[in-house]
């Protein structure tokens, strides 16, 4: 889940928790120059974009394999049951990716973005 809160600057407290979007294992997040929230999802091996007004989720980079899809479904079930899923994070999950997808680096709307992983590789992706 990606949660949204109201921030009270004077006190530093949070209130009015709401769910912006539901997705497997949200990790690193970054606001795009267009105002959408981009989120890396290691378990699904995807980069997702969330419209912050509507909560609509769009896949912007997909490196999910068939085995990875099955692992993601199993991982979601385990998370819902309070169980671990680290044993699902195998090379079969990542396919041709040089490691588990964990983040992204964004430029402006005309620039490519980069996909980061647990290793040292960066993958350059042209925006459509």
Where are the language model's segments positioned?
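Short loop/turn segments immediately following the C-termini of beta-strands
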Residues: 7, 42-43, 52, 117-118
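Structured C-terminal portions of repeat-based eukaryotic scaffold domains
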Residues: 48-76
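Blade-edge beta-strand/turn elements of extracellular beta-propeller
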Residues: 1-25, 54-62, 80-92
